[in-house]
Each structure stands twice: as C-alpha cells, then as structure tokens.
C-alpha cells in the first residue's frame, strides 16, 4: 500500500499483518459478543451505537500505544512512527452468532459477519481521520495510496456491497489526512479470548463441551454462549453435556435437540473447508491487512 518502502519482508508471528523492513504493528481486539442485547420479547440484537463508540475508543487507544511504546531499535521506532499501523480486530464472533441464532456456515451468518467487519472498519477510519485533524497526518501519507483516494481493502472496490459512504471516507482522507496506515487486522486472540471468556478471533467454536479431569474427578466445561442458548430452550442439563462430549464436542448428532438449535450451534469440525473459507472471505473484504486463520483436523487425520 506504500510506494518506495521496499519489499514486504515478514509478517508478525501469526501472519495477519504484512510488514516492511523494521516495521511493527500494535494489535487490539474487541469482544463483539459483549454487544449482544435482548428486547422485551427476548429477541437478540446488536447494540451498534455502543460498538461504534468502542471502535473509536480502541482506535484512539492503539494510536496512543505507538507514542508511548519503548522500542528495542531506533530503526523500528522510526518506522513505527512513520507508518503508524494499528490493527483493530475482533473476538467473540462465534459466541455472538450463537446468541443471534445465526449459523456460522449459513448465508445469513456470512452476511452478518460482513456487516460487522465493515462497521468496525468504517468507524475505525472515521476516528483515524479525526486523529489526523488533531494530532497530525500519517507521516508517510505521501508515499501511500491514500493520496490517490484508494483504501487498503477489497470491499472499497465493491460499491454494490457498501453499507456506508466510503466515497466520503476517501474524500475526507484526501482533505484531512489519516493518522494510521492500517486500522483493521484480525489476530487469532488465542490467549486473550480465554481471559475474556469468549471465542477466539473470527473463528467458530472448536468444541461446545470439554471434559476436564482433576484429582477429585471430572467435570464438564461448556461454551458460555451455547449454554445460554440451551438454557433458553430448556435443554441445559448434565445429559446434554454428556451427549455432546461423546460426540466430540458437537451437538449435531444429539437427536433430541431441535434442528434449529443444532444448526445454530455449529462447531469448527461441523463446518466444511469451503464454509470456513467463505466466512474468512466475508471478513477479509473489509480488513486492511490479513487474518490469522486456524485450521482444525481430527486426531486421526492422515496426509
């Protein structure tokens, strides 16, 4: 996305951001499950206004991190301050889909994922433009394609799929500048999602139920969003957890669970490779750099 900065030489450890020589990138992730709400009839929806404000705050926070960071090398500091890449991503996506009763591998689920990522991408760009007004433009702006009115994600070229006025974003960037070279990247969040108690990155839930063995015996751990759905359906009990565990963490062969519930509570191993790729594409359309993708195989998989 830049001219005359040399070749892309590396990625970060999980591959979601492509980097020029000496270039770092600060990452952060929003637990989107936290924005699920319920109306008086018990129907789930997303609090888009709250998500907008958090997206803007997170973008500002990540820009702050660049300026307060301690860098091991002067060359890294100089490159970080010049390109000012930040990567705001997501976690809790699969949990949010459970709450909304949208199957991860359905057309409706993929459309929602596109809508979600376009929303975060848009408001992160809005905030980065506001930061440029108050703090100064991206130092390497003149070396970027922003000055030509281009945006660093594929969705910008797909006008028929826009839900926001991306022409305004492009024009505002040309008029006011933009603070950050990138604003959106999706990391795997393998550790921080465990701390937050939600699903990782944009991935489907790996298993609905885990059996934990300890000194005094064993007990089941169930995905919290799946538990919520099962409780709403009056299906949450020890038997259903045992049956899911016997089916390798999947509810698909637990016949007494209604089909609509089974369709909503799909796991990574229930989804075909093609469906994984389609979900990935739904997010990638609105992401500035790339996405870390986890591929799961059964223990008896062969090459």
Which residue ranges define each predicted feature?
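Alpha-helix capping and helix-loop boundary segments enriched in small/acidic/polar residues
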Residues: 5, 14-19, 42-53, 76-88, ...
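Function-dense linear segments that define catalytic or interfacial modules
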Residues: 1-80, 92-100, 198, 203-225, ...
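Internal maturation/activation junctions in enzymes
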Residues: 54-77, 81, 103-188, 259-263, ...
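Short, solvent-exposed polar/charged micro-motifs at secondary-structure junctions
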Residues: 1-5, 151-154, 250-255, 303
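Short, flexible loop/turn elements at secondary-structure junctions
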Residues: 29-34, 90, 187-188, 299-301
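Catalytic alpha/beta core of large soluble enzyme barrels
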Residues: 16, 62-67, 162, 172-179, ...
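Structural signal for hydrophobic packing residues in well-ordered secondary-structure cores
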Residues: 31-34, 51-73, 94-101, 117-139, ...
